[in-house]
């Protein structure tokens, strides 16, 4: 098999079209980075003195946004030939589109033997770059960061195929995959920060894993109402979240004084993925009939069973997450609202990476709504998602957060935004929620306004004629 991976001790790295210091790409230190100089193409050559059997390339981007196309080549008797072509998209570092902003890009290749490899990077742009490039004879799960929600689609409008990944090359040597039957849980052997374990004979890899928050916070919100996003997969936490927000309103306003308080609103989902919860292992076994614990290394790209089996486990995980988002989170929120005589109104779609399904998700709410902006393309899929959900689940009213915007304060007027409204009313929207109306109790101009939304309020010069627009 040869060496397991190319390292700084046995490999020479050169890069055409960029500065010196390319050896940092294989020094094992993600803090050292090689930046490109803006040339249309960067050519990275990795040369070693002995053959290796390549099965995976993993690229760690430098900690700055990058989008590029890459080709991996190997040199043979007839020169270089391409063995893998792949995209690198870490263009949006917001954790709402992946809680690991610069997650590694892992690509599998069929076993390829060689000692001279070339990585061609096109379109990366100036001052983007890589921290590490790992060529390995050991297999890894392809695109494991994307498949675990650590890195999600980078722009607002993912198409269906964006979460449909190719079949990985089958392993030529099954012994290179971890046997799930040989994964041992040694949690009980931990004594504080020490591991006290009588390991059976053989070679073992000890992996420590755990659960932590994604770090994503709710927004937009007042400072005193801002904190970590609630767990979407455990109903008990949702009840606590409801009590801390809506519960405060219910406690402070007597029931006889809140006759107009009837609806709880959940906005569009823009808070990234979640791939674990306290009850995940129990829930997983109940759903699928097998134990997820031996497959936890797959979260870090380790192949367990086979490439295909590892992918199937990750599919099951994502399916469970989507179901929990629909039934535990939205279904749970609806049930809690009903206990207080309230109903749930939901924008049943997600932006910038969304771990659920629009129709299933929306079906658990009392009412659904879409959204559209007065200009641009935002809204092109959201309103069909809402109207389709309403048709399927028998919901007669289909609302939309309407005519929203950003910037150009007081620069919009009805004739400017009307074409967008006409379009989405023809796609099934039959109830509009003007975005945004803010009460103006004072007479100072321009009054109180948000940075988002068209100013539907009495301080706008055309507001006295708004009935001609909304009638």
What residues fall within each predicted segment?
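Extended low-complexity, serine/threonine- and proline-enriched intrinsically disordered segments
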Residues: 4, 68-76, 169-177, 181
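Residue-level marker for the onset of beta-strands and adjacent loop->beta junctions
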Residues: 42-44, 68, 105
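Carbohydrate-binding surfaces of carbohydrate-active enzymes
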Residues: 1-24, 34-37, 46, 52-56, ...
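Beta-sandwich interaction modules
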Residues: 86-127
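Extracellular beta-rich ligand/substrate-recognition surface
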Residues: 31-42, 94-101
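Exposed low-complexity, polar/acidic, P/S/T/G-rich flexible segments that act as propeptides
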Residues: 54, 114, 125-175
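Active-site-adjacent "subsite" loops/lids of carbohydrate-active enzymes
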Residues: 24, 97-102, 153-252, 281-321, ...
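Short, hydrophobic/aromatic-enriched beta-strand segments in well-ordered soluble domains
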Residues: 46, 118-123, 206-211
């Amino acid at each position: 098999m040869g060496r397991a991976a190319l390292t700084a001790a046995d490999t020479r790295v050169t890069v055409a079209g960029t500065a010196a210091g390319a050896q940092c790409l294989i020094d094992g230190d993600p803090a050292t980075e090689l930046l490109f100089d803006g040339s249309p193409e960067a050519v990275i050559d990795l040369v070693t003195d002995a053959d290796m059997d390549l099965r995976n390339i993993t690229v760690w981007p430098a900690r700055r946004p990058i989008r590029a196309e890459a080709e991996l080549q190997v040199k043979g008797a007839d020169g270089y030939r391409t063995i893998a072509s792949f995209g690198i998209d870490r263009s949006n570092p917001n954790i709402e589109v992946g809680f690991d902003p610069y997650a590694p890009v892992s690509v599998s290749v069929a076993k390829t033997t060689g000692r001279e490899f070339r990585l061609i990077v096109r379109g990366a742009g100036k001052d983007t770059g890589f921290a590490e490039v790992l060529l390995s004879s050991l297999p890894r799960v392809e695109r494991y960061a994307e498949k675990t929600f650590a890195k999600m689609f980078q722009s607002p409008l993912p198409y269906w195929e964006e979460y449909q990944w190719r079949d990985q090359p089958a392993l030529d040597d099954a012994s290179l995959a971890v046997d799930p039957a040989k994964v041992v849980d040694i949690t009980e052997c931990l004594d504080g920060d020490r591991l006290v374990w009588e390991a059976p004979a053989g070679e073992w890899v000890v992996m420590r894993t755990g659960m932590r928050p994604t770090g994503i916070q709710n927004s937009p919100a007042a400072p005193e109402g801002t904190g970590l996003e609630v767990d979407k997969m455990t109903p008990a936490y949702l009840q606590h979240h409801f009590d801390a927000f809506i519960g405060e309103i219910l406690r402070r306003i007597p029931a006889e004084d809140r006759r107009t308080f009837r609806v709880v609103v959940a906005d569009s989902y823009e808070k990234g993925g979640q791939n674990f919860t306290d009850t995940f292992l129990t829930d997983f076994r109940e759903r699928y009939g097998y134990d997820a614990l031996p497959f936890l290394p797959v979260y870090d790209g380790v192949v367990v069973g086979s490439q295909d089996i590892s992918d199937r486990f990750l599919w099951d995980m994502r399916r469970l997450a989507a179901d929990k988002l629909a039934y535990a989170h939205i279904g749970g929120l609806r049930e809690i609202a009903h206990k207080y005589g309230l109903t749930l109104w939901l924008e049943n779609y997600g932006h910038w990476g969304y771990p659920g399904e629009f129709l299933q998700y929306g079906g658990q709410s009392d009412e659904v709504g879409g959204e559209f902006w007065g200009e641009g393309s935002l809204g092109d899929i959201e309103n069909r998602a809402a109207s389709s959900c309403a048709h399927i689940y028998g919901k007669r009213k289909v609302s939309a957060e309407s005519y929203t915007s950003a910037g150009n304060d007081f620069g919009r007027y009805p004739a400017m935004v009307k074409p967008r409204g006409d379009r989405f009313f023809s796609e099934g929207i039959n109830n509009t929620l003007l975005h945004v109306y803010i009460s103006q109790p004072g007479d100072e101009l321009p009054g109180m306004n948000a940075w988002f939304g068209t100013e539907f309020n009495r301080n706008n010069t055309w507001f006295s004629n708004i009935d001609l627009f909304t009638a």
